[in-house]
Amino acid sequence: MKDLIIIGAGPIGLACGIEAKKNNLDYEIIDKGMLVNSIFNYPVNTTFFSTADKLEIGEIPFISHNVKPTRTEALEYYRRVCDSWKLNLSLYNEVSEILNKNSHFELKTQNGIMNSKKIIICTGFYDIPYLLNIPGEELNKVLHYYNESHPYYKMDVAIVGAGNSAVDVALDTNSSII
């Protein structure tokens, strides 16, 4: 029986794992995908809006070649954090069910049953697309996540979204269409 199971191996899940380790808890961080799976799925040429120091966890310095780090630098940084802290990770291990057993929680995962006194859920929102329920959104050419502009060459494109990411996608796809 673990003291703590953390679901989600993104930056918040890793920060929780570091705190668990500092407090000598028997813990495990599990994720249905890879380490910082959502960051891996960001567009390849992503540059963060935050400076490197705002993304730091566990007193490990995040050194970037620029004022704002890239996706590649972030992936390397979070691997370094895990190695530095020797975090307990169980990757590619999806949780299918969580049962409250009064004195503890039972988690059914693809690798078997896990039991823990406490759980923290740090799954984020990246894997849950916001669907608009409009005709055509189920077509093969409609994507819910953007990676790069190449697939949109010579196509009319509609971008549904708001904020900085939508503007970045609009600028990137516009440069590939022209």
Descriptions of predicted regions:
Residues 1, 6-32, 145-178:
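Rossmann-like dinucleotide/flavin-binding elements
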Residues 13, 36, 48, 98, ...:
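Flexible, glycine-rich phosphate/dinucleotide-binding loops
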Residues 37-76:
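Glycine-rich active-site loop/strand segments that organize a redox cofactor
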Residues 44-45, 126, 163-164:
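Short glycine-enriched loops at secondary-structure junctions
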